[in-house]
């Protein structure tokens, strides 16, 4: 009797296919309990996707947690013998905060781990299985590959202080060139060193194009060894079926990952569906001398594949349309005029219509007209490929997007302001009125000051006048509103301007279109600056 799996949901079909793939590769199924000692996660917080964990006290008084991660538990309990390679696969649920609902969510994962004696053969097998896993999911896919050894080697060659490396890698991962150079300067690097780091941004694309440049940029043996491994892996994956891209800005946590890192994307899904890498540094916390490599497939992301296409995408076109989230208002008008001037205009005047979607198929462009505070949300969740958003909104939302360009438009600054006669009283918390709650918390935490937050949505300047707060945290452009209400700027702590952002998955499939738009946009902004 044959069982027809076509009636199953995409993630159910995938679980059958992946199980067969991993067992054929010699992997044994690993089953773990639902709970784990909280101390394991507390000691390895930076390895987790979020530090938020569901905890409870067991009947014997132990503090336990619903597992937010599987790899940590396997690494802790595997204990491979010397010269032994353990191969496990798993199908488990983990419990993490959801970006959509802002509540904890049960997330289905399948994954594979190789632990113990992990050499070149095991690494090749693991990455090959990652590519085969994407192939089993039945959609066009991209596997993005990088190497922590290459990044560490460059940081060593540039004598970058250990304390500054994590911040620099964070800017690289976000493709945030403008802030990368600022962070490099803050780390004491000279202009040549900052330019060398910035050069990693260009090492992104097809293996044929990027690998020779990766090899040419090597400065020491560590970088050369990493480049050689990347070459071997790309040769291994030459006939994999999807698209293999090198991106030397991709990085994992410094204290855990030491070799290859990779992410897999499916067309039409807004986030990576596969993540993995070599994590010897984590494994050696539990088994000295052991190595490890593995990856996880996020099955719940596949639920989107069974959803109907949104109306805006139902009219198929042979061309690739770039979907732009455009903020309504003065900033949006400035941005649109700039884009229209470089060939991305629409025949329809969006200010003369109540339509929220305007497009120009001849220019391969489609605009979504959205509230400025929602731009980052549309882009992060893949409804739009790119968008223009203020740095204030981007920081407040902590959006997981690529920040590709500082346009310099809409310049202002985030400030602490207070009545003219205000004096800080360190004996009590500062009462802060703001609509930028996360930004305010982060700033005051950085200076070690206790605060009480009062969230407001408008007329923030009124709060200290009425005694509702001591100070406000808000955007200041000219300062006129502050002065007319008897307030003064106490501290300026964050410059703000409009940023060009991109969805990370869209960038894998529409990078040519995005790069072309970026190149034209940079040229237009430079020409505009010269005219001043």
Which residues does each predicted region cover?
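A generic structural motif
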Residues: 60-62, 114-120, 506
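Polyanion/phosphate-binding surface patch
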Residues: 34-64, 414
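Glycine-rich, N-terminal phosphate-binding loop and its surrounding beta-alpha-beta segment
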Residues: 52-101, 375, 380-389
